[in-house]
Amino acid sequence: MGKKPSENSFDYIIIGAGTAGGIIAKKLTDDHYTSVLVLEAGINMTKELSNPNVVTALTNATDNKQSYNVATILEQQIGRQLIAQSGRVIGGSSEHNAMLAVRGSRDLYDEWARLVGNQWSYDSIRSLFKKNETYTGVTQDPEERGFNGPIFVRQQMIPNQGVIQTLSQATSEVFQIPIVEDYNTGIRDCTFFKSQFTQKAKNESFVRSSTSTGYLNRHVVTQGNEFKSDELGVNGRKLMILAKTTVNKILFKEHKGVQIAVGVEFIKDGVSKVMYANKGIIVSAGNFSSVILQRSGIGKPEDLAKAGIKTLIDSPNVGHNFQTHFYAGMGVRVETGRLLQVLGADPNQPLLFGAFKKQDNPTGGRRLQLLGLPVPEFVPVQDVLKNGWQFDPTQPNNIMSIAILNVNPRSRGTVLIAHSDPEAYPTIDMNPLADNDDLNFAIDKYIETYNMIVRARQLDPGGIYEVVYPDESIFQLPNEQEKRTILAAHVRASYTDFTHYGGQCKMGRTIEEGVVDGFLNVFGTRNLKVADLSVAPILPDGNPSTGAQMIGLNAVRFIRNYEKFHELEDFESSDSSDFESSDSSGYESIDSSDFESSS
């Protein structure tokens, strides 16, 4: 391998133009001096994915054109596989998620600060949340909200009175939590009438607001399509997004005993290529971030050996500590007119109620999230079909469903490299219910949520009827052990992930604790960061897309304010023949002569 060709280098290379990576790319190039290359597996599908309807979003997420849908191993505790979904478009999962806007609680981020440093405390990152958003709703605490940011957040439209108010009142009483107007103020325990969504008003309706629309729009980069997928910065911005690329690995050069990240090897149009970074490489590949590190030789040696990868850096936590938010489902019979009121008020996002509550430990954030829909979405489909519970507006009553989420499960899984082939999917084990505490938590919250429905029925006996899944009679069993045994079976039957993932490159204070430090630098390297939800020591305690965007913004803050973590010493004068990589003879270089004002 000869000298690095100067036309094939950028200041930074970002792997992934997703929820966090797209933000980093935009913000780093705002000075029109810093040059950034982004390597993205997907293409721009902003127009195709603009629909604000939650059902459409859930359907789109199953399409492999814009999403990776990777089956897990057979999960022993539930007897079936789960599907790990992640974005495969510019904008990442912010382009096909359900659009719920949830920051997470002050307590959660203060726990991050306790674990890895005050730069992650809620007081340190509040300004990032505010700068990220344009909030168009009502709040009890205006100082907590932003009103001039790139991501639009709206409140749900609801009827003046009805089932939403009934369920929220019952939730407040039974779970002993307050009803608030706005849950995105750092508050931990609460219930609320109006959920919030990342959507912008347009033509008397709404469109999705995402990293793509807010940070990588036509004012920032040219807009690619299926036939011309790459995107270039406009108006002198030094940004290039290479779409339809698959990253193989990161290239390193050893300097004074430290592995310095200097380039990225990737595949585009069936050809292996290499590009170089003068200042740093940022991995923002979501579920695949740990896999890219492993393919680059960073990980636990026994994990790497199984895929035929030689160990460059023994980093035992890479691919471990994988977390998701799991839920058990409940179904309740409700008078149809009450459900139609909610469906009519906000057809795109007809949520019935929501709630958050703390975990058992005295420190840390929430563990419980409740989410209600006017359809049996959270009930196992086989039970819906067997009992004829599909929503039918002509019937006098229908089945609403409640997701009883564990947003800080004790069980942890893995995302591990399965093959040295960069096109191969990883081996994913979500490991649900591996810790029996999670099963007991779900059973306890089943019972508590049932008690909430009993209270709601007292408040509205003509509209709230019986619990049908699990059957109401189970909750009334006099034998406590029998009740819990039967409820455990319903937990296992309905237990599913909520497509919220992270933790497999978690932050820690040492390489024994984590994969990256509190400033996102990969232990054992220089000039290499990871910046996405995979760095979360504990997942944000709610729908985590907003948290992922905050991580991207904080990464930019670190890069700008802690440049000492990034500057590569003496690289320009060094010979690249001793890079820590496979022989790259025959690799094709990218001609960046058409890159607008590239350095």
Regions found by a protein language model. Give the residues of each.
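Extreme N-terminal leader/targeting segments of oxidoreductases
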Residues: 1-11, 558-568
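N-terminal glycine-rich phosphate/pyrophosphate-binding loop and immediately adjacent elements
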Residues: 2-130, 310-317, 324-334
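Glycine-rich loop(s) and the adjacent beta-strand/alpha-helix scaffold that form part
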Residues: 23, 27, 31-37, 42-47, ...
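Conserved redox-cofactor binding core of oxidoreductases
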Residues: 113-249, 253, 261, 469-470
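Mid-to-C-terminal "cap/lid" subdomains and adjacent gly/pro-rich loops that border
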Residues: 156, 236-238, 291, 300-408, ...
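A glycine-rich dinucleotide-binding beta-alpha-beta segment and adjacent secondary-structure elements
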Residues: 243, 248-251, 459-539
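A conserved FAD-binding loop/helix module that cradles the flavin
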Residues: 538-557
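Long, intrinsically disordered low-complexity tandem-repeat segments
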Residues: 571-597
